[in-house]
Regions:
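Alpha-helical substrate-recognition element adjacent to the catalytic core
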Residues: 13-132
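Conserved Lys-Pro-Asp/Glu-containing loop-to-beta segment of HAD-superfamily phosphomonoesterases
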Residues: 14, 134-157
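A short acidic-Thr-Gly-centered motif at the start of a beta-strand
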Residues: 9-11, 86-90, 138-144
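Short acidic, low-complexity intrinsically disordered linear motifs used
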Residues: 1-10
Length: 158
């Protein structure tokens, strides 16, 4: 039998998830809109977040597969990340997890940049701009027992 006091006294499992591009930092990177095998326009991440593709358009994310160019932190969000990482370090093992969940295919450029700031964070590259991919990853974490999830992302689609 499960007792109410057992439920109330157990430590909650908290997951804090941060997007990277245009949430924690802005860098010189473009998404190239392709049609018929050629680039017809380029979008920054903020423009891409609200862009509705036309039939026949596809995207080229090559700028997101290499070292960050001219990255600039978004200070208030990075400070929040640092606070969440500090809480995770001070909590019971496994009670708190902080993750950078990025649409990028390669996490290393993000990891390297964060380490240059003295931030050691777990980076998960999902390799897709489809919001469902991030949602599916978060759902898997909930199924692993996380009962409180905080999510920060610049894109309303996510």
């Amino acid at each position: 039998m499960i007792k109410l006091t057992d439920i109330l006294l157990r430590e909650r499992k908290v997951l804090s998830v941060f997007d990277f591009d245009d949430t924690l930092a802005k860098a010189d990177a473009w998404i190239y809109v392709q049609q018929g095998g050629r680039t017809i326009k380029k979008l920054d991440p903020a423009q891409f977040a609200v862009y509705d593709p036309k039939p026949g358009e596809s995207f080229d994310f090559r700028d997101f597969d290499r070292k960050l160019q001219n990255p600039k932190i978004i200070k208030q969000n990075v400070e929040l990340l640092k606070k969440q990482l500090d809480k995770a370090r001070r909590s019971a093992r496994g009670a708190r997890k902080v993750t950078i969940l990025t649409a990028r295919r390669i996490g290393q450029p993000v990891t390297s940049f964060l380490r240059s700031l003295g931030i050691n964070a777990y980076v998960v590259p999902v390799g897709s701009s489809d919001p469902k991919v991030k949602a599916d990853w978060i759902e898997k974490q909930i199924l692993k027992g996380y009962d409180t999830v905080y999510f920060m992302d610049d894109s309303p689609k996510n």
